[in-house]
């Protein structure tokens, strides 16, 4: 179905500084985002275009053409001034791929077969559905340490658009999941999502990438303190940078992390077919280990490390499914790949809100899951600890050091993603809080998520030591 969003735009609108330079980025973003939200997540295309994309790239949508082909599972975004069109297409098991200077046939020629999750074995009593997190069943929850009515009221507020008026965007909250003492005690969905909807984590994907590095280290396939296995760095000033330094965002190889227009990170995500090559080609600016600089490219360098160790797109996919996802009963999660069959480890992870909570619970349980040590205690202790370069960042996740962001909770750790994605771990209260959505206004994100955390905390008492 082809829709002409608009046929004209005045010269005044096009005269903004740098606006024309942003058109290719905007088209790539829109094609990729619309493809992922329609075909990965099942959202309505008009909802995605009008409520999620337009706020991100306005006023550019007024000159664009958008074609969503449900039969081919493909999205094409063009403009009325040029013949250049951005195309993204869906593949079962690995989501949407943005085509830039490659064809769909090129991408589909890279060997890939999606796997099926393992069969659920019945319990001794014949039951086939275990209680969450080891299955999907849930029960009514009451606990003396929690005022459930107060907790529900606090969590419901982040779905209420009228509670946060005066900001530059809507909340667009898609999910909230709350876990207490390993039990799922609250979940609510919005924007057409439900408990089965794979939801984009954006930079929460970095935490998954960190876990995969930890798994490789646990299995003796990777040494964190040796030079990162990136052949492009041999015989250069970057050759001594270690995987541990990359995990801590302290490799010293920098890119501009700005999502508001044309920048290094938007070029990598929306104008480069080979994202790993772009990420590893950037120059060294600081001495490795000394300087913290948050970067999606750093996580993509880690994804390149994973790919170099394992060898292929299929091997990477099989590894994260079989070694991390399936053991946690994450049955339908995936991370998207670029047009060269390389995992986009900094931004493109999809899973249900319940599954994002499972990842948080894995770290809160020190890597233990249903009697199995999925990640070593040594790895978890390292990942959750401040680095030498930054006291508020560990191995691909954030740390509320000294209660800087949330007072009185120095043990709080969190995964964080663009547009307000969060998985929050609060060990002192035995809580996991997940929030997903499409909130463009940064100040609105911070206010609403802080209100959610404070409200949930007010409804709970500390866990027993």
Go through the PLM ranges and name each one.
Residues 15-16:
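C-terminal motif of bacterial Sec signal peptides marking the signal peptidase cleavage site
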Residues 137-177:
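Beta-lactamase-like hydrolase cores
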Residues 154-157, 183-188, 263-288, 313-333:
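Short, charged, amphipathic alpha-helices and their helix-cap/turn boundaries
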Residues 182, 199-225, 246, 302-306, ...:
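Active-site SXXK
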Residues 210, 297-307, 347-369, 421-437:
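Active-site-proximal alpha-helical segments within enzyme catalytic domains
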Residues 218-253, 281, 311-347, 351:
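Active-site helix/loop module of the DD-peptidase/beta-lactamase fold
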Residues 234-263, 268-290, 295-300, 351-354:
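Conserved catalytic neighborhood of penicillin-recognizing serine enzymes
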Residues 330-337, 381-432:
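Active-site Gly/Thr loop motif
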